[in-house]
Amino acid sequence: MTGLCGYSAPDMRGLRLIMIPVELLLCYLLLHPVDATSYGKQTNVLMHFPLSLESQTPSSDPLSCQFLHPKSLPGFSHMAPLPKFLVSLALRNALEEAGCQADVWALQLQLYRQGGVNATQVLIQHLRGLQKGRSTERNVSVEALASALQLLAREQQSTGRVGRSLPTEDCENEKEQAVHNVVQLLPGVGTFYNLGTALYYATQNCLGKARERGRDGAIDLGYDLLMTMAGMSGGPMGLAISAALKPALRSGVQQLIQYYQDQKDANISQPETTKEGLRAISDVSDLEETTTLASFISEVVSSAPYWGWAIIKSYDLDPGAGSLEI
């Protein structure tokens, strides 16, 4: 059987990996009432976290809010102001999803001092809109977010802060990875944590790790939207469902991505004379990617009044905006 664009369809095993969590979710909806938790009344989900998973954290203590704070990332205090602001912004939302209200408010005050009140609030709402599936003032696609990571990496290289991408072993941090392994199961929390650490690893010149976290963040955005539509995005019930379904769903999506990537690589390696149709499709894809990147750059330029050209070019703020330090 042949699928779209001339690719053969994935085998039944790959489809089962995706259908299993969907079937479980439908069964749960039929057998149990919905336990919807409003966004504004979110409690600390870390209190409901299974003890068996808490044992995976770096210490014997239960997972606490301090592990989600940007200052827990090695070298965070030495990062440049703009990447530092963006990482803090994403992790601020992760703390909020986890119910760490005291840490959220303290970090938000620091973000206000660095980026200004209006710009910070707009960006916070924009991130919430991405996760909840609501329309926002600027629709940023996954491709545009990937382009942002690439532009950030290039900017870091131009300032001489980083060189070539570091080897994988130099980018591994057991403590951070242990936190990630646990947090990724939490609805909402794992999404923003992945986005924040994707930016963090990009600034640390760990581009492979950054792409991995960015991909996981993109998958989580779709999963969180599904859970929100089902009304099961909060509370102990939402946590239990997420812990059961999210790993299977992510594994299925990743296998599909890898399958089509392998198919694409195989088609590229074949003689050009037999792939005229695929070349045409590839040309269209390249044009779309270029258009997306141009659109993203245009959005950055058009949003400059929020930031001022100073923060884009030299990381310096307007005199009335406050301190740059976090």
From Swiss-Prot:
The modification Phosphoserine is found at residue 323. Glycans are attached at residues 118, 274. GO terms for molecular function: cholesterol binding; lipid transporter activity; signaling receptor binding. It is found in: Secreted. GO terms for biological process: cholesterol efflux; cholesterol metabolic process; lipid metabolic process; lipid transport; triglyceride metabolic process. InterPro entries: APOF. It comes from the Eukaryota. O-glycosylated with core 1 or possibly core 8 glycans. Residues 1-35 form the signal peptide. Expressed by the liver and secreted in plasma. Keywords: Cholesterol metabolism, Glycoprotein, HDL, LDL, Lipid metabolism, Lipid transport, Phosphoprotein, Secreted, Signal, Steroid metabolism, Sterol metabolism, Transport. GO terms for cellular component: extracellular space; high-density lipoprotein particle; low-density lipoprotein particle. Residues 36-164 form a propeptide. Minor apolipoprotein that associates with LDL. Inhibits cholesteryl ester transfer protein (CETP) activity and appears to be an important regulator of cholesterol transport. Also associates to a lesser degree with VLDL, Apo-AI and Apo-AII. Belongs to the apolipoprotein F family. This is Apolipoprotein F.
